[in-house]
């Protein structure tokens, strides 16, 4: 699916930066703004697996004022990914995916970064009443100066419940790899920011549920 949007009047923030402080003033302007977006998805069953390809492309052109300097900006991003999952009822549920991303911003300065993301999840029911789950994600960001950050997170759980039994027992292990921080790059309308999120350490939880 392709989408094209053009605006002849836009509301954008007029940005003023003083030291560590930033002041945003929304203003209505006659500056044009154009946006192209293309999204596509193709899936194919191969033997007992399902293969899916995804594409997301976006190009945005707009005018931005920062510290009384007005520039024509381009903010673009492209993502291409695939996923493979089992499609056979007698097999465990397994899904793995990879996404490659490219991001560019030009205006007062030019910058870019790329990303590599892997996601996987697994679910297995065994001995009738037991269910095991595993989730995994990693993300690597690399900027235009070839500097990179990386994080990976894994969560797992095992659940036991008999049929028609109101009791359910489950053990969770969150942040199994004991990752300390989560890093990510993002674009505002005029700059790149690196966000660092501190995450809870590895934790184990025992859950007992009674369903009325």
Task: Name every feature range the model reports, one short phrase each.
Residues 1-212:
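Exposed, low-structure sequence patches enriched in small/polar residues
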């Amino acid at each position: 699916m392709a989408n094209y949007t053009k605006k002849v009047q836009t509301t954008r923030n007029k940005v003023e930066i003083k030291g560590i402080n930033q002041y945003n003033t929304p203003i209505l302007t006659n500056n044009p703004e154009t946006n192209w977006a293309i999204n596509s998805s193709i899936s194919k069953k191969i033997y007992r697996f399902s293969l899916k390809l995804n594409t997301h492309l976006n190009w945005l052109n707009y005018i931005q004022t920062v510290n009384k300097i007005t520039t024509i900006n381009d903010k673009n991003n492209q993502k291409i990914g695939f996923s493979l999952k089992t499609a056979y009822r007698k097999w465990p549920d397994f899904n793995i995916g990879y996404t490659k991303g490219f991001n560019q911003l030009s205006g007062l300065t030019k910058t870019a970064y790329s990303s590599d993301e892997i996601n996987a999840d697994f679910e297995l029911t065994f001995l009738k009443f037991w269910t095991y789950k595993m989730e995994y994600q990693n993300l690597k960001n690399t900027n235009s100066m070839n500097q990179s950050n990386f994080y990976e997170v894994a969560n797992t759980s095992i659940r036991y419940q008999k049929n028609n039994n109101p009791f359910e027992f489950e053990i969770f292990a969150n942040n199994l790899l004991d990752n300390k921080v989560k890093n990510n790059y993002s674009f505002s309308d005029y700059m790149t920011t690196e966000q660092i999120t501190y995450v809870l350490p590895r934790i184990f939880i025992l859950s007992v549920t009674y369903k009325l």
